[in-house]
Amino acid sequence: MSRFQSLLSFVLVSLAAVANAAIGPVADLTLTNAAVSPDGFSREAVVVNGITPAPLIAGQKGDRFQLNVIDNLTNHTMLKTTSIHWHGFFQHGTNWADGVSFVNQCPIASGHSFLYDFQVPDQAGTFWYHSHLSTQYCDGLRGPFVVYDPNDPQASLYDIDNDDTVITLADWYHVAAKLGPRFPLGADATLINGLGRSPGTTTADLAVIKVTQGKRYRFRLVSLSCDPNHTFSIDGHTMTVIEADSVNTQPLEVDSIQIFAAQRYSFVLDASQPVDNYWIRANPAFGNVGFAGGINSAILRYDGAPEVEPTTTQTTSTKPLNEADLHPLTPMPVPGRPEAGGVDKPLNMVFNFNGTNFFINNHSFVPPSVPVLLQILSGAQAAQDLVPDGSVYVLPSNSSIEISFPATANAPGTPHPFHLHGHTFAVVRSAGSSEYNYDNPIFRDVVSTGQPGDNVTIRFQTNNPGPWFLHCHIDFHLEAGFAVVLAEDTPDTAAVNPVPQSWSDLCPIYDALDPSDL
Protein backbone atom coordinates (compact mmCIF):
# COMPACT_ATOMS: atom_id res chain seq x y z
CA MET A 1 0.00 0.00 0.00
CA SER A 2 1.40 3.41 -0.97
CA ARG A 3 1.84 6.15 1.60
CA PHE A 4 -0.97 8.08 -0.13
CA GLN A 5 -3.34 5.09 -0.01
CA SER A 6 -2.45 4.56 3.62
CA LEU A 7 -3.18 8.21 4.38
CA LEU A 8 -6.44 8.04 2.45
CA SER A 9 -7.51 4.95 4.39
CA PHE A 10 -6.67 6.72 7.65
CA VAL A 11 -8.70 9.77 6.63
CA LEU A 12 -11.71 7.67 5.66
CA VAL A 13 -11.56 5.69 8.90
CA SER A 14 -11.19 8.95 10.82
CA LEU A 15 -14.22 10.41 9.06
CA ALA A 16 -16.23 7.31 9.90
CA ALA A 17 -15.17 7.65 13.53
CA VAL A 18 -16.18 11.32 13.53
CA ALA A 19 -19.58 10.40 12.09
CA ASN A 20 -20.10 8.05 15.03
CA ALA A 21 -18.71 10.28 17.76
CA ALA A 22 -21.15 12.19 19.94
CA ILE A 23 -20.87 15.93 20.55
CA GLY A 24 -22.29 18.03 23.39
CA PRO A 25 -23.53 19.24 25.75
CA VAL A 26 -21.58 22.28 24.48
CA ALA A 27 -21.02 22.19 20.72
CA ASP A 28 -20.90 24.09 17.47
CA LEU A 29 -23.23 22.89 14.73
CA THR A 30 -21.99 24.21 11.40
CA LEU A 31 -24.55 23.98 8.62
CA THR A 32 -23.36 23.74 5.02
CA ASN A 33 -24.50 22.34 1.70
CA ALA A 34 -22.59 19.38 0.29
CA ALA A 35 -22.99 16.50 -2.13
CA VAL A 36 -23.80 13.23 -0.38
CA SER A 37 -24.63 9.73 -1.63
CA PRO A 38 -26.00 7.75 1.32
CA ASP A 39 -27.73 5.27 -1.00
CA GLY A 40 -25.26 5.40 -3.88
CA PHE A 41 -27.02 8.29 -5.63
CA SER A 42 -25.32 11.68 -5.34
CA ARG A 43 -27.28 14.86 -4.56
CA GLU A 44 -26.82 18.14 -2.71
CA ALA A 45 -28.01 18.12 0.89
CA VAL A 46 -27.98 20.09 4.12
CA VAL A 47 -25.23 18.70 6.34
CA VAL A 48 -24.24 19.39 9.94
CA ASN A 49 -20.52 19.37 10.72
CA GLY A 50 -20.10 17.75 7.32
CA ILE A 51 -22.51 14.82 7.71
CA THR A 52 -26.11 13.73 7.43
CA PRO A 53 -27.74 12.45 9.54
CA ALA A 54 -26.37 15.14 11.82
CA PRO A 55 -24.01 14.12 14.66
CA LEU A 56 -25.37 12.48 17.78
CA ILE A 57 -25.69 15.08 20.53
CA ALA A 58 -25.32 13.53 23.98
CA GLY A 59 -25.32 14.66 27.58
CA GLN A 60 -26.59 13.73 31.01
CA LYS A 61 -29.72 14.50 32.95
CA GLY A 62 -29.20 17.87 34.60
CA ASP A 63 -26.89 19.21 31.88
CA ARG A 64 -27.03 22.67 30.39
CA PHE A 65 -26.92 22.40 26.61
CA GLN A 66 -25.28 25.23 24.69
CA LEU A 67 -25.62 24.48 21.00
CA ASN A 68 -24.28 27.14 18.69
CA VAL A 69 -25.84 26.90 15.23
CA ILE A 70 -23.60 28.43 12.56
CA ASP A 71 -25.49 28.97 9.30
CA ASN A 72 -23.18 28.71 6.29
CA LEU A 73 -25.91 27.52 3.92
CA THR A 74 -25.63 28.70 0.31
CA ASN A 75 -28.24 26.65 -1.60
CA HIS A 76 -31.45 28.65 -1.96
CA THR A 77 -33.35 25.57 -3.19
CA MET A 78 -33.00 24.02 0.29
CA LEU A 79 -33.26 27.41 2.04
CA LYS A 80 -30.34 29.49 3.23
CA THR A 81 -32.06 30.38 6.51
CA THR A 82 -32.81 27.86 9.23
CA SER A 83 -33.95 27.13 12.76
CA ILE A 84 -33.49 23.98 14.83
CA HIS A 85 -35.99 22.26 17.11
CA TRP A 86 -34.72 20.04 19.93
CA HIS A 87 -37.47 17.47 19.77
CA GLY A 88 -38.98 16.26 23.04
CA PHE A 89 -37.44 18.81 25.40
CA PHE A 90 -39.82 20.77 27.60
CA GLN A 91 -37.85 24.04 27.30
CA HIS A 92 -39.42 25.28 30.53
CA GLY A 93 -38.38 28.91 30.82
CA THR A 94 -36.67 28.81 27.41
CA ASN A 95 -39.61 28.78 24.99
CA TRP A 96 -37.48 31.03 22.78
CA ALA A 97 -35.10 28.07 22.26
CA ASP A 98 -37.75 25.62 21.02
CA GLY A 99 -36.66 26.41 17.48
CA VAL A 100 -39.89 26.62 15.49
CA SER A 101 -39.63 29.27 12.80
CA PHE A 102 -42.39 31.89 13.11
CA VAL A 103 -43.74 30.37 16.32
CA ASN A 104 -40.77 30.67 18.69
CA GLN A 105 -38.27 32.67 16.63
CA CYS A 106 -37.37 34.20 13.29
CA PRO A 107 -35.05 32.03 11.21
CA ILE A 108 -31.28 32.36 11.43
CA ALA A 109 -29.81 34.08 8.37
CA SER A 110 -26.96 32.61 6.36
CA GLY A 111 -23.68 34.08 7.53
CA HIS A 112 -24.99 34.34 11.08
CA SER A 113 -25.08 32.11 14.15
CA PHE A 114 -27.42 31.63 17.08
CA LEU A 115 -26.84 29.97 20.46
CA TYR A 116 -29.55 27.67 21.76
CA ASP A 117 -28.97 27.61 25.51
CA PHE A 118 -31.28 25.45 27.63
CA GLN A 119 -31.33 23.30 30.75
CA VAL A 120 -32.49 19.69 30.97
CA PRO A 121 -33.11 19.32 34.72
CA ASP A 122 -35.69 16.54 34.76
CA GLN A 123 -35.61 14.64 31.48
CA ALA A 124 -33.57 11.72 30.20
CA GLY A 125 -33.98 9.38 27.28
CA THR A 126 -33.99 9.44 23.51
CA PHE A 127 -34.67 12.65 21.61
CA TRP A 128 -33.67 14.14 18.25
CA TYR A 129 -33.16 17.47 16.55
CA HIS A 130 -34.10 18.84 13.17
CA SER A 131 -34.75 21.94 11.14
CA HIS A 132 -38.13 23.47 11.88
CA LEU A 133 -38.30 25.67 8.81
CA SER A 134 -40.49 24.51 5.93
CA THR A 135 -39.40 21.04 4.69
CA GLN A 136 -35.68 21.61 5.24
CA TYR A 137 -35.13 18.60 7.49
CA CYS A 138 -36.08 16.27 4.63
CA ASP A 139 -32.91 17.48 2.89
CA GLY A 140 -30.65 16.28 5.71
CA LEU A 141 -30.81 18.60 8.74
CA ARG A 142 -31.81 15.94 11.29
CA GLY A 143 -29.97 13.89 13.89
CA PRO A 144 -30.30 11.94 17.16
CA PHE A 145 -30.00 13.39 20.67
CA VAL A 146 -29.58 11.28 23.83
CA VAL A 147 -29.70 12.36 27.47
CA TYR A 148 -28.30 9.64 29.71
CA ASP A 149 -29.58 9.05 33.23
CA PRO A 150 -26.73 8.13 35.63
CA ASN A 151 -29.42 6.54 37.81
CA ASP A 152 -31.39 4.80 35.07
CA PRO A 153 -33.98 2.64 36.85
CA GLN A 154 -33.74 0.03 34.06
CA ALA A 155 -29.94 -0.19 33.95
CA SER A 156 -30.01 -3.78 35.22
CA LEU A 157 -31.73 -4.89 32.01
CA TYR A 158 -28.81 -4.18 29.68
CA ASP A 159 -25.02 -4.23 29.51
CA ILE A 160 -24.27 -1.76 26.73
CA ASP A 161 -25.76 1.66 25.90
CA ASN A 162 -23.50 3.99 23.95
CA ASP A 163 -23.03 5.96 20.72
CA ASP A 164 -23.04 2.71 18.72
CA THR A 165 -26.44 1.56 19.99
CA VAL A 166 -28.37 4.48 18.47
CA ILE A 167 -30.30 3.45 15.35
CA THR A 168 -31.73 6.16 13.11
CA LEU A 169 -34.34 5.61 10.41
CA ALA A 170 -34.81 8.18 7.65
CA ASP A 171 -36.64 8.49 4.37
CA TRP A 172 -34.39 9.77 1.60
CA TYR A 173 -35.31 11.45 -1.66
CA HIS A 174 -33.22 11.96 -4.79
CA VAL A 175 -34.79 15.38 -5.36
CA ALA A 176 -34.69 18.30 -2.93
CA ALA A 177 -37.98 18.69 -1.05
CA LYS A 178 -38.77 22.06 -2.64
CA LEU A 179 -38.26 20.65 -6.15
CA GLY A 180 -40.21 17.43 -5.69
CA PRO A 181 -43.96 16.87 -5.55
CA ARG A 182 -45.96 18.65 -2.85
CA PHE A 183 -46.94 15.24 -1.49
CA PRO A 184 -44.39 12.56 -2.49
CA LEU A 185 -45.70 9.06 -3.12
CA GLY A 186 -42.78 7.48 -1.30
CA ALA A 187 -39.09 7.86 -0.63
CA ASP A 188 -36.36 6.65 -2.95
CA ALA A 189 -34.60 4.89 -0.07
CA THR A 190 -34.78 4.13 3.63
CA LEU A 191 -31.57 5.05 5.43
CA ILE A 192 -30.61 3.15 8.58
CA ASN A 193 -27.82 4.96 10.40
CA GLY A 194 -27.37 7.07 7.29
CA LEU A 195 -26.93 4.27 4.76
CA GLY A 196 -29.31 2.42 2.47
CA ARG A 197 -30.22 1.36 -1.03
CA SER A 198 -32.77 2.41 -3.58
CA PRO A 199 -34.10 -0.06 -6.18
CA GLY A 200 -31.56 1.39 -8.62
CA THR A 201 -28.56 1.29 -6.26
CA THR A 202 -28.59 -2.20 -4.78
CA THR A 203 -24.79 -2.39 -4.45
CA ALA A 204 -24.55 0.57 -2.07
CA ASP A 205 -23.13 -0.03 1.40
CA LEU A 206 -25.48 -0.93 4.24
CA ALA A 207 -25.14 -0.02 7.88
CA VAL A 208 -23.61 -2.74 10.06
CA ILE A 209 -24.49 -2.89 13.75
CA LYS A 210 -22.13 -5.10 15.70
CA VAL A 211 -22.93 -7.13 18.80
CA THR A 212 -21.07 -9.64 20.96
CA GLN A 213 -22.80 -12.90 21.74
CA GLY A 214 -24.02 -13.02 25.33
CA LYS A 215 -24.32 -9.25 25.78
CA ARG A 216 -27.54 -7.27 26.23
CA TYR A 217 -27.85 -4.03 24.29
CA ARG A 218 -30.04 -0.99 24.80
CA PHE A 219 -30.78 0.12 21.26
CA ARG A 220 -32.30 3.56 20.82
CA LEU A 221 -34.48 3.60 17.71
CA VAL A 222 -35.12 7.10 16.35
CA SER A 223 -37.44 7.94 13.47
CA LEU A 224 -36.01 10.92 11.60
CA SER A 225 -38.70 10.40 8.97
CA CYS A 226 -40.30 13.22 6.99
CA ASP A 227 -43.22 11.09 5.97
CA PRO A 228 -43.63 7.30 6.09
CA ASN A 229 -43.89 5.21 9.21
CA HIS A 230 -41.69 2.13 9.24
CA THR A 231 -42.15 -1.38 10.59
CA PHE A 232 -38.89 -2.32 12.27
CA SER A 233 -37.70 -5.84 13.08
CA ILE A 234 -34.53 -7.90 13.41
CA ASP A 235 -34.54 -11.43 12.04
CA GLY A 236 -34.29 -14.09 14.73
CA HIS A 237 -34.56 -11.66 17.66
CA THR A 238 -37.21 -10.21 19.91
CA MET A 239 -37.02 -6.72 21.39
CA THR A 240 -37.99 -5.62 24.90
CA VAL A 241 -39.29 -2.04 24.76
CA ILE A 242 -38.30 0.03 27.81
CA GLU A 243 -38.81 3.61 26.61
CA ALA A 244 -41.18 5.53 24.35
CA ASP A 245 -40.40 9.17 23.45
CA SER A 246 -38.14 9.69 26.51
CA VAL A 247 -40.64 8.12 28.93
CA ASN A 248 -39.53 4.91 30.68
CA THR A 249 -41.98 2.08 30.16
CA GLN A 250 -42.67 -1.21 31.83
CA PRO A 251 -40.69 -3.79 29.82
CA LEU A 252 -42.73 -5.13 26.89
CA GLU A 253 -41.45 -7.88 24.60
CA VAL A 254 -42.30 -7.47 20.92
CA ASP A 255 -41.05 -8.82 17.61
CA SER A 256 -41.84 -5.77 15.47
CA ILE A 257 -42.26 -2.04 16.05
CA GLN A 258 -44.32 0.27 13.87
CA ILE A 259 -42.60 3.61 14.43
CA PHE A 260 -44.13 6.84 13.17
CA ALA A 261 -42.31 9.98 12.07
CA ALA A 262 -40.50 11.58 15.05
CA GLN A 263 -41.16 8.77 17.53
CA ARG A 264 -38.42 7.06 19.53
CA TYR A 265 -38.19 3.71 21.31
CA SER A 266 -35.51 2.08 23.41
CA PHE A 267 -35.47 -1.68 23.32
CA VAL A 268 -33.21 -4.29 24.88
CA LEU A 269 -31.81 -6.90 22.51
CA ASP A 270 -30.31 -10.03 24.00
CA ALA A 271 -27.54 -11.14 21.63
CA SER A 272 -28.14 -14.79 22.41
CA GLN A 273 -28.45 -16.22 18.90
CA PRO A 274 -25.79 -18.17 17.00
CA VAL A 275 -22.87 -16.09 15.72
CA ASP A 276 -24.05 -14.96 12.29
CA ASN A 277 -25.38 -12.04 10.26
CA TYR A 278 -29.07 -11.11 10.62
CA TRP A 279 -31.16 -8.72 8.56
CA ILE A 280 -32.41 -5.57 10.24
CA ARG A 281 -35.59 -4.46 8.46
CA ALA A 282 -37.38 -1.10 8.32
CA ASN A 283 -40.20 -1.42 5.83
CA PRO A 284 -41.90 1.88 4.94
CA ALA A 285 -45.69 1.99 4.88
CA PHE A 286 -45.66 2.98 1.20
CA GLY A 287 -43.27 3.70 -1.66
CA ASN A 288 -40.39 1.31 -2.31
CA VAL A 289 -41.52 -1.44 0.05
CA GLY A 290 -40.06 -4.89 0.63
CA PHE A 291 -36.44 -5.97 0.83
CA ALA A 292 -35.41 -6.96 -2.71
CA GLY A 293 -31.74 -6.22 -3.25
CA GLY A 294 -31.27 -5.19 0.37
CA ILE A 295 -33.48 -2.08 0.30
CA ASN A 296 -34.98 -0.97 3.64
CA SER A 297 -32.31 -3.00 5.42
CA ALA A 298 -29.20 -3.02 7.57
CA ILE A 299 -27.09 -5.81 9.05
CA LEU A 300 -26.83 -7.06 12.63
CA ARG A 301 -23.41 -8.73 12.79
CA TYR A 302 -22.23 -10.83 15.71
CA ASP A 303 -18.52 -10.65 16.50
CA GLY A 304 -16.89 -13.54 14.68
CA ALA A 305 -19.40 -13.68 11.83
CA PRO A 306 -18.07 -13.38 8.28
CA GLU A 307 -18.37 -9.97 6.60
CA VAL A 308 -21.11 -11.03 4.22
CA GLU A 309 -24.75 -10.15 3.78
CA PRO A 310 -27.23 -12.15 5.85
CA THR A 311 -29.21 -15.05 4.45
CA THR A 312 -31.83 -14.95 7.21
CA THR A 313 -35.51 -14.82 6.36
CA GLN A 314 -38.28 -12.74 7.86
CA THR A 315 -40.95 -14.52 9.85
CA THR A 316 -44.49 -13.28 10.38
CA SER A 317 -44.75 -10.94 13.33
CA THR A 318 -46.76 -12.50 16.16
CA LYS A 319 -46.02 -9.89 18.84
CA PRO A 320 -46.19 -6.48 17.16
CA LEU A 321 -45.95 -3.44 19.40
CA ASN A 322 -49.41 -2.22 20.38
CA GLU A 323 -49.33 1.28 21.88
CA ALA A 324 -52.17 0.52 24.29
CA ASP A 325 -49.97 -2.19 25.86
CA LEU A 326 -47.32 0.37 26.86
CA HIS A 327 -47.42 1.68 30.42
CA PRO A 328 -45.11 4.05 32.29
CA LEU A 329 -42.49 2.39 34.47
CA THR A 330 -43.47 4.59 37.40
CA PRO A 331 -47.06 5.77 37.85
CA MET A 332 -47.88 9.05 36.11
CA PRO A 333 -51.25 10.52 37.11
CA VAL A 334 -53.53 11.40 34.21
CA PRO A 335 -54.73 15.02 34.36
CA GLY A 336 -58.45 15.54 34.94
CA ARG A 337 -61.17 13.15 36.01
CA PRO A 338 -61.45 9.54 34.77
CA GLU A 339 -64.31 10.21 32.35
CA ALA A 340 -64.69 11.48 28.79
CA GLY A 341 -64.27 15.24 28.73
CA GLY A 342 -63.42 15.27 32.44
CA VAL A 343 -60.95 18.14 32.12
CA ASP A 344 -60.84 21.91 32.56
CA LYS A 345 -60.62 22.53 28.81
CA PRO A 346 -61.50 19.93 26.16
CA LEU A 347 -60.53 20.58 22.54
CA ASN A 348 -61.62 18.74 19.41
CA MET A 349 -59.42 18.93 16.33
CA VAL A 350 -61.44 18.40 13.14
CA PHE A 351 -59.24 17.57 10.15
CA ASN A 352 -59.92 18.50 6.52
CA PHE A 353 -58.10 18.76 3.20
CA ASN A 354 -58.99 20.69 0.03
CA GLY A 355 -56.58 19.03 -2.38
CA THR A 356 -53.83 21.53 -1.62
CA ASN A 357 -53.87 22.37 2.09
CA PHE A 358 -54.78 20.67 5.36
CA PHE A 359 -57.15 22.32 7.85
CA ILE A 360 -57.76 22.00 11.59
CA ASN A 361 -61.14 23.34 12.64
CA ASN A 362 -61.44 25.06 9.25
CA HIS A 363 -58.10 26.88 9.45
CA SER A 364 -54.89 26.04 7.59
CA PHE A 365 -51.77 27.23 9.40
CA VAL A 366 -49.91 29.99 7.56
CA PRO A 367 -46.68 31.07 9.29
CA PRO A 368 -47.09 34.63 10.60
CA SER A 369 -44.54 37.31 9.75
CA VAL A 370 -44.09 38.00 13.48
CA PRO A 371 -43.36 34.90 15.60
CA VAL A 372 -46.16 34.04 18.02
CA LEU A 373 -43.80 34.34 21.00
CA LEU A 374 -42.82 37.86 19.91
CA GLN A 375 -46.50 38.76 19.54
CA ILE A 376 -47.12 37.66 23.13
CA LEU A 377 -44.03 39.47 24.44
CA SER A 378 -45.28 42.58 22.62
CA GLY A 379 -48.53 42.52 24.58
CA ALA A 380 -50.98 40.32 22.67
CA GLN A 381 -52.65 37.97 25.16
CA ALA A 382 -56.03 36.85 23.81
CA ALA A 383 -56.62 34.43 20.95
CA GLN A 384 -58.41 37.09 18.90
CA ASP A 385 -55.28 39.27 19.08
CA LEU A 386 -52.86 36.55 17.96
CA VAL A 387 -52.13 35.54 14.39
CA PRO A 388 -52.52 33.46 12.34
CA ASP A 389 -56.22 34.02 12.99
CA GLY A 390 -58.02 30.84 14.01
CA SER A 391 -54.83 28.83 14.42
CA VAL A 392 -53.84 29.99 17.92
CA TYR A 393 -55.59 28.51 20.97
CA VAL A 394 -55.01 30.27 24.29
CA LEU A 395 -54.89 27.82 27.21
CA PRO A 396 -55.26 28.79 30.89
CA SER A 397 -52.50 28.02 33.37
CA ASN A 398 -52.52 25.02 35.72
CA SER A 399 -55.39 23.39 33.88
CA SER A 400 -56.11 19.93 32.55
CA ILE A 401 -56.45 19.82 28.77
CA GLU A 402 -57.93 17.05 26.63
CA ILE A 403 -57.47 16.99 22.86
CA SER A 404 -59.39 14.63 20.60
CA PHE A 405 -58.26 13.88 17.05
CA PRO A 406 -61.15 12.18 15.23
CA ALA A 407 -59.54 10.63 12.15
CA THR A 408 -61.50 11.06 8.96
CA ALA A 409 -61.26 10.21 5.28
CA ASN A 410 -61.49 13.99 4.73
CA ALA A 411 -57.79 14.21 5.65
CA PRO A 412 -55.98 11.66 3.44
CA GLY A 413 -52.48 10.39 4.11
CA THR A 414 -53.40 8.63 7.35
CA PRO A 415 -52.19 7.79 9.89
CA HIS A 416 -51.11 11.31 10.81
CA PRO A 417 -48.57 11.38 13.69
CA PHE A 418 -49.22 14.44 15.88
CA HIS A 419 -46.53 16.07 18.01
CA LEU A 420 -47.04 18.50 20.88
CA HIS A 421 -44.09 20.71 21.79
CA GLY A 422 -43.25 21.54 25.40
CA HIS A 423 -44.91 18.47 26.95
CA THR A 424 -45.40 14.79 27.10
CA PHE A 425 -49.07 13.79 27.15
CA ALA A 426 -51.13 10.84 28.32
CA VAL A 427 -52.56 8.83 25.44
CA VAL A 428 -55.91 7.97 27.00
CA ARG A 429 -57.20 6.49 23.74
CA SER A 430 -54.83 4.98 21.20
CA ALA A 431 -55.29 4.37 17.49
CA GLY A 432 -57.02 1.07 16.80
CA SER A 433 -58.74 1.06 20.18
CA SER A 434 -62.14 2.26 21.39
CA GLU A 435 -61.10 1.92 25.04
CA TYR A 436 -60.21 4.86 27.28
CA ASN A 437 -57.44 4.33 29.83
CA TYR A 438 -57.32 6.89 32.64
CA ASP A 439 -55.36 4.57 34.92
CA ASN A 440 -51.91 3.89 33.44
CA PRO A 441 -51.71 5.04 29.80
CA ILE A 442 -48.40 5.69 28.10
CA PHE A 443 -47.12 9.27 28.11
CA ARG A 444 -45.28 10.37 24.98
CA ASP A 445 -44.85 13.36 22.64
CA VAL A 446 -45.82 11.94 19.21
CA VAL A 447 -48.98 9.90 18.70
CA SER A 448 -50.47 8.23 15.66
CA THR A 449 -53.99 9.53 15.11
CA GLY A 450 -54.89 6.34 13.28
CA GLN A 451 -57.42 5.62 10.56
CA PRO A 452 -60.95 6.89 9.87
CA GLY A 453 -63.11 5.80 12.79
CA ASP A 454 -60.36 6.31 15.36
CA ASN A 455 -60.66 9.09 17.95
CA VAL A 456 -57.21 9.28 19.51
CA THR A 457 -57.37 11.35 22.70
CA ILE A 458 -54.57 12.89 24.74
CA ARG A 459 -54.34 14.80 28.02
CA PHE A 460 -51.77 17.12 29.57
CA GLN A 461 -51.45 19.79 32.24
CA THR A 462 -50.64 23.41 31.41
CA ASN A 463 -47.52 23.93 33.52
CA ASN A 464 -45.23 25.45 30.88
CA PRO A 465 -46.03 29.03 29.79
CA GLY A 466 -45.44 29.91 26.16
CA PRO A 467 -46.65 29.15 22.63
CA TRP A 468 -46.23 25.47 21.73
CA PHE A 469 -46.69 24.00 18.27
CA LEU A 470 -49.10 21.08 17.78
CA HIS A 471 -48.77 19.58 14.32
CA CYS A 472 -48.68 16.61 12.02
CA HIS A 473 -45.07 15.41 11.87
CA ILE A 474 -45.34 14.38 8.24
CA ASP A 475 -43.33 17.38 7.10
CA PHE A 476 -45.10 17.69 3.77
CA HIS A 477 -48.44 17.89 5.61
CA LEU A 478 -47.09 20.48 8.05
CA GLU A 479 -45.90 22.55 5.07
CA ALA A 480 -49.50 22.37 3.83
CA GLY A 481 -50.85 23.93 7.04
CA PHE A 482 -51.55 20.90 9.27
CA ALA A 483 -50.85 22.67 12.59
CA VAL A 484 -52.09 24.92 15.37
CA VAL A 485 -50.36 26.83 18.16
CA LEU A 486 -51.32 26.29 21.80
CA ALA A 487 -50.49 29.54 23.60
CA GLU A 488 -50.20 28.44 27.19
CA ASP A 489 -50.62 30.90 30.07
CA THR A 490 -50.03 34.03 27.99
CA PRO A 491 -50.04 36.41 31.03
CA ASP A 492 -46.99 34.65 32.53
CA THR A 493 -45.11 33.91 29.30
CA ALA A 494 -42.82 36.96 29.40
CA ALA A 495 -41.87 36.58 33.06
CA VAL A 496 -41.12 32.86 32.76
CA ASN A 497 -39.23 33.09 29.45
CA PRO A 498 -36.70 35.96 29.50
CA VAL A 499 -35.17 36.21 26.03
CA PRO A 500 -31.52 36.93 25.19
CA GLN A 501 -30.58 39.91 23.02
CA SER A 502 -29.37 37.52 20.33
CA TRP A 503 -32.95 36.23 20.02
CA SER A 504 -34.34 39.75 19.74
CA ASP A 505 -31.84 40.43 16.94
CA LEU A 506 -33.04 37.50 14.80
CA CYS A 507 -36.16 39.16 13.35
CA PRO A 508 -34.58 42.47 12.25
CA ILE A 509 -31.80 40.54 10.51
CA TYR A 510 -34.23 38.12 8.86
CA ASP A 511 -36.71 40.81 7.84
CA ALA A 512 -33.95 42.73 6.03
CA LEU A 513 -32.97 39.76 3.85
CA ASP A 514 -33.38 39.78 0.09
CA PRO A 515 -35.84 37.05 -1.03
CA SER A 516 -32.93 35.23 -2.69
CA ASP A 517 -31.29 34.84 0.73
CA LEU A 518 -34.25 33.25 2.53
UniProtKB/Swiss-Prot annotation:
It is an enzyme of class 1 (oxidoreductase). Its EC number is 1.10.3.2. Cu cation 4 binds at residues 416, 472, 477. Residues 1-21 form the signal peptide. Glycans are attached at residues 72, 75, 229, 354, 362, 398. One of its GO terms (molecular function) is copper ion binding. It comes from the Eukaryota. Disulfide bonds join 106-507, 138-226. The keyword Repeat applies. It catalyses: 4 hydroquinone + O2 = 4 benzosemiquinone + 2 H2O. Its cofactor is Cu cation. SUPFAM superfamilies: Cupredoxins. Binds 4 Cu cations per monomer. One of its GO terms (cellular component) is extracellular region. Cu cation 2 binds at residues 87, 130, 473. Cu cation 3 binds at residues 132, 421, 471. Keywords: Copper, Disulfide bond, Glycoprotein, Lignin degradation, Metal-binding, Oxidoreductase, Repeat, Secreted, Signal. Its main location: secreted. Residues 23-148, 160-302, 369-489 form the Plastocyanin-like domain. This is Laccase.
